[in-house]
């Protein structure tokens, strides 16, 4: 009888250990009332607005090992973004148009978004520039940060 209880207990533990990773990687879309999704969207908004003004968001927003791909296909790092954040700005009317957060477990999210700015293209100072992007967020040490970003310039609506 005791052996049967031990086997039942061992089976329950094994099943739990197998199911926990499956549960942890379930995906879900962030809802309007999700506190973490709201935080992520707000930080994305600040980064989009940071094209126009130095709002100091980059230092905490991007992970130290961040890698991005620009609209021209060039790679950039957190150090590149910090330098860019301190440079002279020509853009105005910067803003976030859309951001949708898709969570994968409790520590990873992918954000699909779009933004705009006027005057970002120095060769056309009055032209509106629009881009869509995908940012990958990771929660490490209790903090959410962007670890990767890919930008793509698109025709403005």
Give the residues covered by each predicted segment.
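A beta-strand edge to alpha-helix "cap/lid" segment located at domain peripheries
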Residues: 23-157
């Amino acid at each position: 009888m005791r052996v049967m209880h031990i086997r039942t207990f061992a089976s329950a533990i094994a099943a739990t250990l197998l199911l926990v990773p499956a549960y942890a990687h379930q995906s879900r879309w962030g809802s309007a009332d999700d506190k973490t999704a709201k935080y992520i969207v707000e930080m994305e908004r600040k980064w989009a607005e940071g094209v126009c003004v130095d709002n100091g968001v980059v230092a905490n927003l991007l992970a130290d090992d961040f890698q991005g791909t620009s609209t021209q296909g060039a790679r950039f790092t957190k150090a590149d973004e910090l330098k860019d954040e301190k440079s002279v700005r020509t853009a105005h009317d910067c803003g976030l148009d859309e951001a949708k957060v898709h969570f994968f477990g409790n520590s990873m999210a992918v954000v699909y978004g779009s933004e705009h700015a006027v005057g970002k293209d120095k060769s056309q100072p009055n032209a509106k520039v629009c881009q869509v992007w995908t940012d990958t967020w990771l929660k490490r040490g209790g903090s959410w940060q962007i670890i990767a970003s890919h930008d793509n310039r698109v025709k403005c609506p």
